[in-house]
């Protein structure tokens, strides 16, 4: 929900309101859906949020993550992977599924906002947008360096054409 709310609206939201908003969003049975779930043995173990960039209020109004050009891109804004599944490649599988889903729904370009871990590890609380290395392995290229003094990690904007090889 973070990406679907303006900064000032997020600052006033409490956990219950965010959870309720998320449930309302999912219950709308939207097409396209607001994201994709990964299941193992009938249990949800991962999530990726993917939608047209304009669906994300925070991006529409962002000075930190500016609109690069007029290409109508789909944005991949966050991943959630259960602790038991981390380190097993699920984020890459979710990314592949998100790219395919966006293409199926007419995306011409894909955009994301990962962190660059460099040689180190990134805490899950900071790496929820994905790691640069994961996106680079999927054919994305850095198109913008995000300069944010309050960020504890290097963040970038990456893009790739939507056509999948």
Question: Residues of each region from the PLM?
Answer:
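Short beta-strand micro-motifs in enzyme catalytic cores
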Residues: 34-36, 72-74, 152-158
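Conserved acetyl-CoA-binding loop-helix of GNAT-fold acetyltransferases
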Residues: 78-81, 87-104
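Conserved GNAT acetyl-CoA-binding A-motif
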Residues: 95, 102-126
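C-terminal "cap" of GNAT-fold acetyltransferases
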Residues: 125-138, 144-165
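Active-site rim helix/loop that mediates acceptor-substrate recognition in acyltransferases
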Residues: 2-35, 40
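Short, well-ordered beta-strand micro-motif
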Residues: 37-39, 49, 157-161
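Conserved acyl-donor/pantetheine-binding loop and adjacent beta-alpha core of acyl/acetyltransferases
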Residues: 25, 39, 43-80, 122-132
